[in-house]
Amino acid sequence: MSTSLSYRDAGVDIDAGDQLVENIKPFAKRTMRPEVLGDLGGFGALVEIGKKYQNPVLVSGTDGVGTKLKLAFDWDKHDTVGIDLVAMSVNDILVQGAEPLFFLDYFACGKLDVPRATDVIKGIAQGCEESGCALIGGETAEMPGMYPVGEYDLAGFAVGVVEKENVITGRSIGVGDVVLGLASNGAHSNGYSLIRKIIERDNPDLDAEFDNGKTLREAVIAPTRLYVKPILAALEKFTIKGMAHITGGGITENVPRVLPENTVAQIDAKSWELPKLFQWLQKAGNVETQEMYRTFNCGIGMVVIVAAEDADAVQGLLGEQGETVYRLGLIRERQGDEHQTQVA
């Protein structure tokens, strides 16, 4: 007679999954909003739209962390990639004026390492808490044979809400409007395939002091900056005509996504100093300047476009909220079919 098999024998540990849920409950609880009905653990999560909205529009976004995760595996650094995961989605929906309401995560692995997964999801909860977004649920998928030992993948899903009349589309952007840039916290979650290639080829001392007391390793793995609370504070007082979250495609490919076809964002390359991380990447990888602008955020994580008469006040308010804000340039008329972001 053959030996009796269990799910654990097949590589799936239900007890480990249950332990992870218990571990993350306190973190998730701290993120809750009054709109959330019920607790973690149900088949679905219930969220009501607040009565303060007359004509609410839901805005959704989904994203991952990309190959930055490979560095997390190699360096055994798992406590900040969850922040990256949240930031990539909530910053995206923020661009349309949405206040993030709730977030769900998907964590997939070959064998569940409970302490490591706890670190990851603790970071997700931290990102949610910092952006005022409720972590209402998720999926932990233990799939034997699907991932190498010690590796996992992440996906995140954010939903926010905005009054219909306040949806930011970029359609009102016009000639003479001012382009502001909010400083990034490093490479955020994009360009890491190139970063890893540069590190592999250059073989730098990752633990030597690199910038302002940080090592190169710390500079490379630094989490994506969350812009939610400062931008929402600005939206309470001013009209923001358009925003661009600078992600894959860098500055030159993301800003046009919010511009009317007859306009160009003319950005002065001297209006901000290229942070040391990007200086090193460009030099070590011998990366051409235009390739830098279309691959990395180059120190600008969010672009905000406002009327000229509001620019000083918006810049000041965002500065009071803790952001470093640069006046990058102006919106001008487009000539022919020229690219809609010009950095010079």
UniProtKB/Swiss-Prot annotation:
Pathway: Purine metabolism; IMP biosynthesis via de novo pathway; 5-amino-1-(5-phospho-D-ribosyl)imidazole from N(2)-formyl-N(1)-(5-phospho-D-ribosyl)glycinamide: step 2/2
GO cellular component: cytosol
NCBIfam families the record matches: purM
Cellular localization per UniProt: Cytoplasm
Principal subcellular localisation of the protein: cytoplasm
Single GO term (MF): ATP binding
Entry keywords, A to Z: ATP-binding, Cytoplasm, Ligase, Nucleotide-binding, Purine biosynthesis
Family statement drawn from the similarity comment of this UniProt entry: Belongs to the AIR synthase family.
InterPro entries xref list: PurM-like_C_dom, PurM-like_C_sf, PurM-like_N, PurM-like_N_sf, PurM_cligase
HAMAP family in UniProt: AIRS
Protein's recorded name: Phosphoribosylformylglycinamidine cyclo-ligase
Tagged with keyword Membrane: no
Single GO biological process annotation from the record: purine nucleotide biosynthetic process
CDD domains noted in UniProt: PurM (cd02196)
Catalyses which reaction(s): 2-formamido-N(1)-(5-O-phospho-beta-D-ribosyl)acetamidine + ATP = 5-amino-1-(5-phospho-beta-D-ribosyl)imidazole + ADP + phosphate + H(+)
UniProt keyword Nucleotide-binding present: yes
Enzyme Commission number(s) from the entry: 6.3.3.1
